[in-house]
């Protein structure tokens, strides 16, 4: 029978930190995916506005929150570009945070696997 390593308070703190980091990592991945989809949708909307003729581009409905606001094509393009820029900025921040969290999780994994070996499993099943 293999001897089991004792779990110290520091080890438990690392395990807890890893668990919290994993939850945050999962949340950040979902947020990044959502923001990437939003940027793609904005790009598609911008392309569609370019395809409109002069008559149709005079009043284009755009959903903001729970209501629709009518824009002309120039105003809508400005609105879409501003929305895209702000979304890309937030996406870059979230991606940076995700990379930092992932690096910290890898560091914690090395420490815990070094002490406990195959007695623990910290790898996500995907």
UniProtKB/Swiss-Prot annotation:
Pfam families per record: Prefoldin_2 (PF01920)
Family membership: Belongs to the prefoldin subunit beta family.
Protein name per UniProt: Probable prefoldin subunit 4
Organism: Caenorhabditis briggsae
One MF annotation (Gene Ontology) recorded for this entry: unfolded protein binding
GO cellular component term, pick one: cytoplasm
Gene Ontology biological process: protein folding
InterPro entries named among the record's database cross-references: PFD_beta-like, PFDN4
Role noted for this protein: Binds specifically to cytosolic chaperonin (c-CPN) and transfers target proteins to it. Binds to nascent polypeptide chain and promotes folding in an environment in which there are many competing pathways for nonnative proteins. Appears to play a non-essential role.
SS bond list: none
SUBUNIT field: Heterohexamer of two PFD-alpha type and four PFD-beta type subunits.
Chaperone listed as a keyword: yes
Domain of life: Eukaryota
Gene assigned in the entry: pfd-4
PANTHER family referenced in this protein's UniProt entry, alphabetically: PREFOLDIN SUBUNIT 4
Keywords associated with the record: Chaperone
């Amino acid at each position: 029978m293999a001897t089991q390593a004792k779990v110290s308070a520091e080890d438990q703190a690392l395990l807890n930190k890893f668990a919290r980091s994993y939850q945050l990592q999962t949340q950040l991945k979902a947020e990044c995916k959502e923001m990437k989809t939003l940027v793609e949708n904005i790009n598609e909307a911008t392309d569609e506005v370019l395809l409109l003729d002069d008559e149709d581009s005079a009043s284009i409905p755009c959903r903001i929150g729970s209501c629709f606001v009518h824009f002309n094509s120039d105003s809508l393009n400005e609105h879409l570009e501003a929305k895209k820029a702000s979304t890309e900025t937030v996406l870059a921040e979230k991606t940076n945070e995700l990379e930092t969290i992932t690096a910290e999780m890898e560091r914690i994994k090395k420490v815990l696997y070094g002490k406990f070996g195959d007695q623990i499993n910290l790898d996500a099943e995907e």
